[in-house]
Amino acid sequence: MAPQNFPTLFGRVASRSDRRVFGLRPTDRFSHVYVIGKTGTGKSSLLETMVLQDMAHGHGVAFIDPHGDIVTRIHDRVPPWRRGDIRYLNVPDAEQPFGYNPLRRVRHERIPLAASGILEAMKKVWGDAWGVRMEHILRNAVFALLEQKNAALSDILRMFSDKAFRKEVTQSLRNPTIRTFWEKEYERYSFGYRADGIASIQNKLGALLSDPTLRRILTAPKEDIRIRAMMDEGRILLVNLAKGQVGEDSASLLGALLVTTVGLAAMSRAEVEQSDRRPFFCYIDEFQSFTTLSVANMFSELRKYNVGMVAAHQYLYQLESDIRHAVLGNSGTVISFRLGAEDAAYLSREFGQVVSERDLLNLANHHIYLKLMIDGMPSKPFSAETLAPT
């Protein structure tokens, strides 16, 4: 079934004289939706309301859930006629067949962008161990492996420990700078200098891949998730990162790599006519755990490729200032549930001080203030109640 161009309804105007139900048209959602609010105020319910309609309307969606509660409910409510479209990456389930390889099927002209996204994701999660030498060596390893046909994250470690493998990879490289690094610079490193540079990489990546389930997902799945194909075919990707079971670092890195790949897959649609780019919507709960500056900067590009992001989290200052400005500056619809004092002051200014700090501090659960994108233009801020999932 072709996707339907129906609006996604999610709110009712909170006015005695105006109780209209409202929502967003698909074209306005390509300008992205940013959702913020304290725990327990209704964010999860809003995301559920929206994604259930997307599936019913025939759209392709991805939902990245750090805990699994929301995607479990969504999975149980997928319309029967769409169940064949589901790819459920349930990370803690040792029997699930799906996996994801961030190094595979990257077009040559996209390698620099992919490498930057992968490195930023690793730096975000492994920041306590990050250093200039570590980044330099890791960058050259990632660039080299992105040129290979069937590389996996485990091959990063092989680049350091297996001289024959390193030589085989190096001989096939098209990038002369990366080739020179491995043939000349790396080979000149003393044992101690080399060991100091790669020890943290081996420790961090080794710990990630020592979990048998994560290793299988990242290096040897029965079925590889191909995000670009899922976009073009309008499929449903549900991701349970199970942070409480696999650990925060592992869940955050896998989520950040997935979000980066969604962006890269979207931009690879440049080769497809605008009218043939099927709408695709990506939901990210606890957005701050998975976003990098590369991802935030992609927001301005994604709308051209008919991909809309729905990013939700609890506190503005969970985001670094440059990421915060990039996300808010490129989100056409901004939705606020109840906030803390610091965030209320910031959002009041974002809403042009039409909404006071006190208004944002005192919102009841499932009540919101928002700026809504309507036919390509943001509305004035107004108050509303969110609709329950149906």
Describe the residue ranges of each PLM region.
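C-terminal regions of RecA-like/P-loop NTPase motor modules
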Residues: 1-8, 316-390
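Conserved H-loop
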Residues: 66, 312-318
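Catalytic or ion-translocation cores adjacent to nucleophile or general acid/base/metal-coordination motifs
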Residues: 308, 313, 332
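P-loop NTPase motor domains
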Residues: 2-19, 26-28, 33-41, 46-307, ...
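Short beta-strand elements
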Residues: 23, 228-229, 383-388
